[in-house]
């Protein structure tokens, strides 16, 4: 079997209905939405229709709370820099140790500028250290910025409760919801989240389009300045075709949300199939609430890069948080934050499904993985099955005889 795509947390295939919605704006409606003549009208209408569709999926109270951007990374940078510009006397930021680089890189930059960054840790299952979070909240904090769902493990964070706690101390709260939107129901009007980032290409929309949710009456400073677009909050002529595509993708995600139950069933089947047929494996976030589409399993004593290469040979696309994919000799920062031992962290593989995933594809992956792992372990200097000892009380605390 070929073309089994299980890397949907990286990007998704564009839905044919999304492409169909975009085509008129690539072919026929080429006017500038800011223009008052007839060529601008259809583009302006498409822009506002998409804004309504995005607001509906996010459960926003007002369509004006949606600001279109080029991507979620831009939205996240905008949120962070806006918050610190509005509270220059507050020189602390709270984030987590397992954020996406879009957040971590900005925080590292600000740390070099003199900001104190509180990086909230996680347990070995990826659960947030809430006690550490509450201790870090103070009048010196300008912003809390954290993800709703982790991109590597799928573990969900209690962002609604975290946002309420931040508000009680007068702190703005931003959420990176890239991996949550379209996979779990979201109602922002029922939360205290001030700002939220999301992306079109993670929900079967086009690349090059994202948005920032900005709660009404939240003070704001734009990052991209120039024209009056997006009510003066994000300058630059809008990517109308991309925005229309994002709107269509959001509407379809809303319609197909019930399908996430069947996606979760396939995810569970994949987990069970791999864990029961391959020894010395660990499911990341096994006992934590997770997105319904994400499986991250560590296969001990082998490298994730080698697994991916052999999977690709079998026509299966997946992803790894191990050293190879980042060009580093270390496992991913998420695996290290979870304190996953060396021999397991290097062999972690993420399989991420979508509503386009089929059961036969899951069965094909289950069939191929045992042989792949067995072949690689015969080449591993760490794999001496008759000498591996499992320490009492933990699957991954090996000693070598």
Swiss-Prot record:
List of residues that carry N6-(pyridoxal phosphate)lysine: 202
Positions of [2Fe-2S] cluster binding: 324
GO biological process, alphabetically ordered: amino acid metabolic process; nitrogen fixation
Keyword Iron-sulfur listed: yes
UniProt cofactor(s): pyridoxal 5'-phosphate
Residues at the active site: 324 (cysteine persulfide intermediate)
UniProt KW Transferase keyword: yes
Name of the protein in its database record: Cysteine desulfurase
Taxonomic path: Bacteria, Pseudomonadati, Pseudomonadota, Gammaproteobacteria, Enterobacterales
Annotated gene: nifS
